[in-house]
Amino acid sequence: ERIARLVLIATAAKASPWTIAIDETQRMAIEADATFGQPRNDAGMKGLAAARAIGLLTYRGAAGYNLTQQDREELPAAHRASTYQQYQGEKLCRRYNAYSYYAILNAFDTHDVGRGRGGTDAALARIAARTLLVGITTDMIFTPAEMRALQRQIPGSEYHEIDSPFGHDGFLVEHEQLNDILRPFMEGQPTENNN
């Protein structure tokens, strides 16, 4: 009743075993850094860089990497994909410390909209807002199948898909597609599911 419109982009009702496994792999990378656990802000930074590199593989996926990280030389001194992973790991280390990232991973794993609300089906069935769900064709974190399941559970909801080689990050890259999906919905116009 308080919310007239709800947009859910590349998400799920609860953490899946797959996403928990991805997060655990990142935690293991952080824990493998011998400095993690020491009482200082820069502890675990090599582990954090490795964890970020692991996470990026799932955010972008094979198609995204194969499209953007091809080597331009026959025998490069450093592969583009390698330097990209290193750069992204170092970049995250400038914004986070390992303890914060570790806590975020733990929080992700506890996500469950049905907890304390009679289960997932009951919680989603109570949504009265006009709801738009947007999935991404190559998202391996929150798959189109999971998004379609949400659509079946939320009364009267609509489902659209962004066609993108960039996996979960597709909604950050495919601005025009996302705008074309969101604009009519936000303006209150009727939309047709594209899937």
Regions found by a protein language model. Give the residues of each.
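Residue-level signal for short, function-critical loop segments
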Residues: 12, 137-139
